[in-house]
Amino acid sequence: MGNEFDISNAGGLVPMVVEQNARGERAYDIYSRLLKERVIFLIGPVEDYMANLVVAQMLFLESENPDKDIHLYINSPGGSVTAGMSIYDTMQFIKPDVSTVCVGQAASMGALLLAGGAAGKRYCLPHSRMMIHQPLGGYQGQAADIEIHTKEILNIRQQLNEILAKHTGQDAETVARDTDRDNFMNGTQAVEYGLIDAMLDKRPVS
């Protein structure tokens, strides 16, 4: 169950891993092999196809072992709110804890998904960048329809702010103010804000 959206962006050059056992050899693409280790990649813009793959992988891993953590690695500029919310809701719905790790960037919806990981298990690597802001609009059409869409985007903004407030420990007013414009954070700032729990230099010793 590899991440085809990652593969296409890499020009089709996907490393293969060959495993040997008593029954012979089996080749996996690198993403499928890491899925066996309960590692999922959320790479690139958040859109419906990518979200479906991530959701499917989480549900599969829950069916395999509902008591073992899932590790979600995020490097995303954000994207579709509805696609992102399908991932977020699944993260909250399934039994396993979902540990989130930012590698590169987690902006907009990517930052919300990073913050939505299991409490105490949200991380970034040292040179990662996080960014939170309000959802973007841009609907064109009749005045009545524009008014409808304006109300909807304001409702979505409030919903996203409430989610960020829940996971960061900030109050809703603070989040509303801090997301009014693009708000970039490094790892230290993200920890202080409550977006993540720790910045990792090395993999923790198990």
From Swiss-Prot:
It is found in: Cytoplasm. PROSITE patterns: CLP_PROTEASE_HIS, CLP_PROTEASE_SER. It catalyses: Hydrolysis of proteins to small peptides in the presence of ATP and magnesium. alpha-casein is the usual test substrate. In the absence of ATP, only oligopeptides shorter than five residues are hydrolyzed (such as succinyl-Leu-Tyr-|-NHMec, and Leu-Tyr-Leu-|-Tyr-Trp, in which cleavage of the -Tyr-|-Leu- and -Tyr-|-Trp bonds also occurs). Its main location: cytoplasm. Keywords: Cytoplasm, Hydrolase, Protease, Serine protease. One of its GO terms (biological process) is protein quality control for misfolded or incompletely synthesized proteins. Cleaves peptides in various proteins in a process that requires ATP hydrolysis. Has a chymotrypsin-like activity. Plays a major role in the degradation of misfolded proteins. Fourteen ClpP subunits assemble into 2 heptameric rings which stack back to back to give a disk-like structure with a central cavity, resembling the structure of eukaryotic proteasomes. Belongs to the peptidase S14 family. This is ATP-dependent Clp protease proteolytic subunit. The gene is clpP.
